[in-house]
Amino acid sequence: MTTRRDDDLDRAAIWQDFVLAAHLLEVALERQSQRDGNISHGHFKLLVLLSAAENQTLGLKALAGMLRFSPSRVSHTLNVLERQDLVTRGRVPTGRRAYEATLTSQGRLLVARVLRAQRAEIRDVLFGSLGAADAAALGRISARVVRVLDEAEV
């Protein structure tokens, strides 16, 4: 019979493994983004969101929400990316006092190059080590983690 203490120890070990896995994945993505794109992974995530958006454009408020960044952090990130000609920023055409960011052609090329390297060096290696059932479980668990953290507004 499993005791409460054993359950707590099991959960603590699982938690430590999960935190380490998340950290190592972020380290690998950061290293790869720097090497193949000369860009931080935090900045790269913003470019990826723009690349997937309609007309490769998103409002700054939407970007902040998706990335869980403060408005000032989004603004700072966009300043850096604008200087590198990876994005442009302008007013929303509807006349509101809102702003939006658009991925440039240079930004699209960078996203394609870095994603190609990520796929080969990180994603395919990770999924190659998992069977179909484990990959599906990882997908379900990842979606649940996102949902729980979103609901908790952590």
What are these regions (language model features)?
Residues 25, 29-32, 67, 110, ...:
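Alpha-helical linker/hinge and terminal dimerization helices associated
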